Amino acid sequence: MSDEKICVGAIAGAYGVRGELRIKSFCATAEDIETYSPLTSEDGQRHFHLALVRPIKGGFVARIAEVSSKEEADALKGVQLFALRDQLPSLPDDEYYYTDLIGLQVLDTGGELLGSVKTVADHGAGDILEVQRPGTSETILLPFTRAVVPTVDLLAGKLIADPPEGAL
């Protein structure tokens, strides 16, 4: 069993006065966050038994067994929620968890090093890779599409990119 943790959501704050919380889910099917319970904090010191109550704009109202007041709920604002990788579903060959992409070397189609993946962001229309250029603080943004990133090789720790004109 793998001890690797994946961030599946975050606590956005209290909802009401009875200890309910606003939860943001980062799961492909947002409701699935409940099935990975108990979730942990990033350091693994806190465990949360999550039960979704109802959907709201931008997430869910949830109850956590360990939280019974607004003050306790407020204290958890910003806590990221993690599940063990083994709890998550296997992905098809052409899909990746963001955490697997971060740190990969990015090469252009000619084999030149463009940098490494710093972050992956979902901007609604699609995922964007932020690539840290080597030896500088400069970053470039690349759409994470098959046209721009035709090859991802997790075992080799790299991906091949064909940046759009003007991206560099």
Curated annotation (Swiss-Prot):
Paired cysteines (S-S): none
Localisation per UniProt entry: Cytoplasm
Gene Ontology biological-process annotations: ribosomal small subunit biogenesis; rRNA processing
Cross-referenced Gene3D superfamilies: PRC-barrel domain (2.30.30.240), RimM (2.40.30.60)
GO cellular component: cytoplasm; ribosome
UniProt domain comment: The PRC barrel domain binds ribosomal protein uS19.
Family: Belongs to the RimM family.
Known function: An accessory protein needed during the final step in the assembly of 30S ribosomal subunit, possibly for assembly of the head region. Essential for efficient processing of 16S rRNA. May be needed both before and after RbfA during the maturation of 16S rRNA. It has affinity for free ribosomal 30S subunits but not for 70S ribosomes.
Assembly description: Binds ribosomal protein uS19.
Protein name: Ribosome maturation factor RimM
Species for this entry: Roseobacter denitrificans (strain ATCC 33942 / OCh 114)
